[in-house]
Amino acid sequence: MIVYHKDFFVNRLVKEWLSHEKLIIACDLDDTIIPYNPELTDSCTETVQLIKDCQTEGITFIINTARQGSKLSSSVEQVEALGIKVHAINKMPSNWALPIGIAGKVYANIFLDDRGGLECTKHQLRKAFEIVKQFREQQLLQSL
């Protein structure tokens, strides 16, 4: 078994990212990528940059929020204005085959949410991104 990182969760993210050529990220909005509380503005900015970095290595990005109607529509526009490509909202992308047994739950390799250990998951995602990027750069150099 190949071990890319000593942390089980980082290692699992890297293996999934490399084996599927992409990673699925589900993300909350308020205080995760859109600041609601002013003291979390820097954290939101970091999260946005991390997602944009990950997009360079191939991700599917799903907004996973309780917002509805016009608040949701304006939020999606705000996220896209930040430079994040949104693939789906509160569901899997239409071109994605659902695994058996997820019963309507959004499937993702990682969930980013200010109420769900955001700093820890950001750290894990950042490490996984760095490893995947370095691995792919090494593969490219070896192929030359």
Enumerate the language-model features and the residues they cover.
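HAD-like aspartate-dependent phosphatase fold
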Residues: 1-144
